[in-house]
């Protein structure tokens, strides 16, 4: 590759036109107010932090507020039944074009062909799971599979597809026990931003960029799930001590994720999302009977 001048490149002005969510999230993400095309954001959080719920809500908002844009959700782990359960908490999921990889024999070909259709914003859940499915269905090893996924994203980020669409990506990735990004450090260098989701009190969470090429970093934006959508707040709400008998106090989605992780760790059992939710509902019912 030889040196180039920006004026000699044919970069469309559309890459500077943000896709808005019409929420406080827009100014938090970029100085232009919204998610920009041709960006790759890694969304990092621990088990039960609400990464998937937040990302689905965000993609749904982008789709609703930008009707001419095409949005795609790549579900690497959860199948249609799992997501139907999740949609009872995040109704926007019902309207999203979703590519399911569970049980697919050739996910590599399916992902390639689907992305070639040209999408403005793609949510991938998750980088680890998708690259793992590539590894188990091809001759590529773990490192090569991860590189294949990253290379494919950057290909579409640069508009190298039949529709010349400069795709933006939200890519979920698990955090380590210490709360940091789990993966190759080169990913952090190459991407547009690293967005961390951290838990607060009850249903509250906050977002914080450790790196953001398109906006500010090390600034917190608080939010909570309320009536099927994320509600954003500039400051964390004051926690008021309850005057009535407490409930379990953990959001159902987060609790289900914890149950699933515990079953895997202690009993080496892989629960489906539906099984995890069923256990949570039974525990909640039992708890309510005990505190009557």
Regions found by a protein language model. Name each.
Residues 155-246:
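Phosphate-binding/switch region of NTP-binding enzymes
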Residues 37-109:
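Conserved P-loop
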Residues 264-277, 291:
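Charged, low-complexity interaction regions
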Residues 30-38:
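Phosphate-binding P-loop
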Residues 247-263, 279:
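Short amphipathic alpha-helical heptad-repeat segments
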């Amino acid at each position: 590759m030889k040196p180039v001048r920006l004026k000699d490149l044919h970069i469309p002005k559309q890459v500077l036109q943000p896709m808005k969510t019409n929420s406080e999230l827009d100014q938090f993400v970029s100085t232009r107010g919204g998610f920009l095309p041709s960006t790759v954001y890694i969304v990092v959080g621990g088990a039960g932090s609400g990464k998937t719920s937040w990302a689905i809500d965000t993609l749904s908002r982008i789709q609703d507020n930008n009707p001419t844009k095409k949005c795609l959700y790549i579900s690497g782990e959860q199948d249609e039944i799992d997501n139907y359960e999740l949609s009872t908490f995040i109704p926007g999921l019902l309207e999203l074009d979703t590519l399911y990889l569970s049980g697919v024999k050739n996910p590599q070909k399916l992902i390639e062909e689907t992305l070639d259709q040209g999408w403005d914003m793609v949510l991938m859940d998750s980088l680890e799971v998708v690259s793992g499915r590539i590894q188990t269905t091809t001759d590529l090893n773990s490192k090569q599979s991860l590189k294949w996924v990253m290379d494919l994203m950057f290909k579409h980020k640069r508009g190298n597809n039949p529709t010349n669409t400069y795709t933006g990506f939200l890519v979920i990735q698990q955090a380590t026990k210490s709360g940091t990004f789990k993966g190759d450090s080169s990913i952090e260098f190459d991407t547009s931003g690293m967005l961390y989701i951290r838990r607060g009190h009850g249903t509250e969470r906050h977002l914080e960029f450790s790196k953001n090429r398109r906006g500010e970093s090390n600034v917190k934006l608080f939010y909570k799930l309320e009536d099927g959508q994320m509600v954003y707040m500039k400051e964390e709400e004051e926690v008021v001590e309850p005057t009535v008998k407490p409930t379990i106090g953990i959001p159902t989605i987060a609790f289900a994720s914890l149950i699933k992780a515990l079953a895997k760790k202690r009993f080496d059992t892989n629960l489906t999302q539906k099984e995890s939710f069923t256990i949570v509902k039974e525990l909640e019912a039992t708890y309510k009977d005990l505190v009557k």
